[in-house]
């Protein structure tokens, strides 16, 4: 028995009946020989971790276009926070951590430069609307490895595509990443805005702080624990109605108080000048020579 087969056996014996087992993967578009050591989702995680698009995340801003200081989030730090949150939930629910991690590490590969402002500009340039989740899938399927793609499993691509659509991922692991993404960006956008003195902790509505917590750490703890306690032993990933509604309201506060202030006026103004000029130049160049 190979090391991979031993790991797959342990998955069958220890993971939840609702987990996505490596041996039950729908496979890859181009069939490959199995690795002697790593199951399929672990191989996918490694491919994403070592691809060029993943390394480029470090220079893509999350919210602030030109942050002064090293402590503001980038797409890379956001991705790592999503992965950490998702793995914590998956481990507690005995779901497949390798699948969760692969989806989390790949979910934002298709995001634009210049944060949300860059996406705003590119959305106006494209013949069809630009969606970063679709671009993420395009990267792993067609652009990486000189056009060969990473040949990821169906489950990982499904989780990447549906982490931000009306459709839900087909696996519980994908649903975990979908919620973990929201948990991460809602909280760290507010944390960065407080650091940038755009708002203070006291600006957050009191009722939301009473429900979710009076600090970023407390809110993360509340949301993650709520998902675990409400999803354990079930074939879905859910939250309590009270906490879910509070998270929705906190997201609205985040958009209104953080995104619109940090990249709304300033971001769109820059999108009409420097950032727009850069995106226009790159778009025109690649459109002329695909």
Residue spans of the language-model regions?
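Histidine-centered, transition-metal-coordinating active-site segments
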Residues: 1-79, 83-89, 96-97, 130-290
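Short glycine-enriched loops at secondary-structure junctions
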Residues: 54, 106-109
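A short acidic, glycine/proline-enriched capping/turn motif at secondary-structure boundaries
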Residues: 87-89, 108-111
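Post-HEXXH active-site segment of zinc metalloproteases
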Residues: 98, 102, 115-130, 196-197
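Short alpha-helix carrying the canonical HExxH Zn2+-binding catalytic motif
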Residues: 101-106, 179
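Alpha-helical ligand/cofactor-binding cores
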Residues: 105, 119, 137
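Short active-site segment of divalent metal-dependent hydrolases/proteases
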Residues: 110-114, 184
